[in-house]
Amino acid sequence: MMTVKRRIFDRIRNALTLAFGLIYLIPLYMAVTNSFKTYADIIKSPLALPTAPTLDNFVEAFHASNIASLYGTSILITVSSVALLILISSTAAYVIIRRNNGICKFLYAFALIGIMVPPVVTLVPSIKTLSMLHLLYKPSGLLMFYGGAYFSTTIFLYTGFINSIPISLDESAYMDGASTITIFFRIIFPLLKPCTATAVILMGMWIWNDFLNPMYILGSTAGRTITTGIYNAIGAYTSQWNLVFANVILASFPIVILYLCMQKQFMSGLTAGAVKG
């Protein structure tokens, strides 16, 4: 009886897995295949493989959408935001774990509240604050927003990892005359590579793919990111879906490369966090 129930459960689970997998894979399949088709081929058979693949869509989209400028703005904001998050979160996590007093525990618990609050909820108050600080419509304003919005998640990653590092390493370095800053940056931080890789990929992906926050915080005066630029391109190319799909692939390319380059460290960070955290 249990075997029959188990088989039914497995079939339902597999069917649901397949259904949800198709929901995610079909749009990806369409974006990739249609980016290599002409407009006529897309209208004729949007789900078919390209019979005569062409790279003209990418060339035209690259020049027409000014992808180079969009890449530059997005890379500047993403790299700066991720670097700021890693620096602040790792040092804060180190102090919280090593001090381990009531104040640090309270501040850590207070910081984790941000995980339960979606960044979009804080968008309007953040816009008001940035306007008061004269940072609205400036890349530095968006940088500050990301630093606050994703601080909770990043410090959560680092505290779990640093907690697994023996304090005896610090004590030995103190006996040799090393300062706290030297101990952290020369001994502790190099041990955080798996956690840092996880943070880089997660934060980099979220910030690179973010659309709503750059649209409102940067506006149209401080330069467009890759997502807001693609949004404007879609408005201009509603009758040229081959260019729309090419733009989407060009926007996704850097994140795919980042993941492929850091895949080993990313998986190591996830498994280490699961075992040690």
Residue ranges and their predicted role:
Residues 3-277:
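A structural signal for multi-pass alpha-helical bundles of membrane permease subunits
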